[in-house]
Amino acid sequence: MNEAIIQLDHIDITFHQKKRVIEAVKDVTVHINQGDIYGIVGYSGAGKSTLVRVINLLQAPTNGKITVDGDVTFDQGKIQLSAEALRQKRRDIGMIFQHFNLMAQKTAKENVAFALRHSSLSKTEKEQKVIELLELVGLSERADNYPAQLSGGQKQRVAIARALANDPKILISDEATSALDPKTTKQILALLQELNRKLGLTIVMITHEMQIVKDICNRVAVMQNGVLIEEGPVLDIFSNPKEALTQEFITTATGIDEALEKINQQDIVKHLPANALLAQLKYAGTSTDEPLLNSIYRQFEVTANILYGNIEILDHIPVGDMIVVLEGQAENILAAEKALHEAGVDVSILKRGA
C-alpha cells in the first residue's frame, strides 16, 4: 500500500481584510498517496486555489499540520523547516497553470532551461536535460520556437517540461486545461497519465470540471465554501455521491440530466403503460459484464426497452448508466427489481405507468 506523500491535517486558512475575517479553508484534512492522481474539485470561491498555496508550501495555514514526503513543514501556523530545507521541499513540487506563464522572449528550450538556472548541473548536463524533457512531452521539434509560434496545447507541454526540470515528486495542475479545447485537453490529460506511470509522479488536479476528474483521477475531494464536503475513490464518488453538490458535478460530467430531458419528451414515456415503469440503472465492475436485461426477461418475462445507455472506465473499472422502460406483470417487475439489486445494480424508479 502506498504511503501518503502529502498530508494536510485539520487545515484552517483565515484572512483579515479591514474589518472582515475570511475563512478561506475550514478544517480540511486530505491525505494524498504516492502515485495518486488526486482531484480537488469545486466552483470558484470553494477554496481550491488557497489550498494549492498550502500544498506547494507558499502559504502557511492559520491552523493545522502539513507533512510533505515524511517531513512536517508547517504545524499550527509555524514553519518547521529551515529556510534552505523549505526551498528544497518547494523544488520537489512542480506547478502548471491555466495560462502557461511562459516567457514570450524565450524559446521553448530556453523556457525549460530557465527552471534549471539554480541547478548544480553543468552547462552540458543542463542542455541535455532540456532535450530529454522536451522529448518526454513530445515537443522536440519545437525546441527553437517562441511561445507565439505554439498552439495552446504545445505551450502547456513546454510548461509541463519546465515544471519537471528539477525532478519533482509532486506535480500540481491548477486548472491547467481550462483554456484548452476538448481535443487538446484529452491529449494533455493523456500526457499527464503517461508521466504518472513512467515517472511515478504524484499529480494533484485542481479543477472545477468533474469531467477532468472522471478522465484521469483515482481519488477526488469535493470542496464548497472552504469546506471539504466529500472525499474518496473516484469510482465510489461517481457510483454513490452523498452530497447535492457532488451529484450536480457528476450529472454535468455524465450528461444524464440532458438525456433525461430528451427521454421525457418521448411518447413511450409520456404515455407509460400501466404495467410499465421508467427506471435508471447504475452498475459497476463485474455487473457490467453480465447480460442482466436478458436474464430478467428469461426469468421474469420482464422486457426492457433501453432509452439511454453509457459505459465508461473509471480508475480502470467499467461503470454503466442506463435508462430503461421495464414492462411486465407487477409482481414480476418487483422480482426483477430485486434480482437487479442482488446483482449489484442500483435501481432508481423515475416514473410508474398510470
UniProtKB/Swiss-Prot annotation:
EC number: 7.4.2.11
Keyword hit for Translocase: yes
Binding-site residues, ATP: G42, Y43, S44, G45, A46, G47, K48, S49
Domain spans labelled ABC transporter: 8-250
Stored Pfam families: ABC_tran (PF00005), NIL (PF09383)
GO molecular function: ABC-type D-methionine transporter activity; ATP binding; ATP hydrolysis activity
Membrane topology, as annotated: Peripheral membrane protein
Compartment(s) where it occurs, according to its Swiss-Prot or TrEMBL record: Cell membrane
Reaction(s) catalysed (UniProt annotation): L-methionine(out) + ATP + H2O = L-methionine(in) + ADP + phosphate + H(+); D-methionine(out) + ATP + H2O = D-methionine(in) + ADP + phosphate + H(+)
Gene Ontology annotations for the cellular component aspect, listed alphabetically: plasma membrane
Known role: Part of the ABC transporter complex MetNIQ involved in methionine import. Responsible for energy coupling to the transport system.
Family note: Belongs to the ABC transporter superfamily. Methionine importer (TC 3.A.1.24) family.
Subunit details: The complex is composed of two ATP-binding proteins (MetN), two transmembrane proteins (MetI) and a solute-binding protein (MetQ).
Name used for this protein in its record: Methionine import ATP-binding protein MetN
Organism, as annotated: Streptococcus pyogenes serotype M4 (strain MGAS10750)
Gene name for this UniProt entry: metN
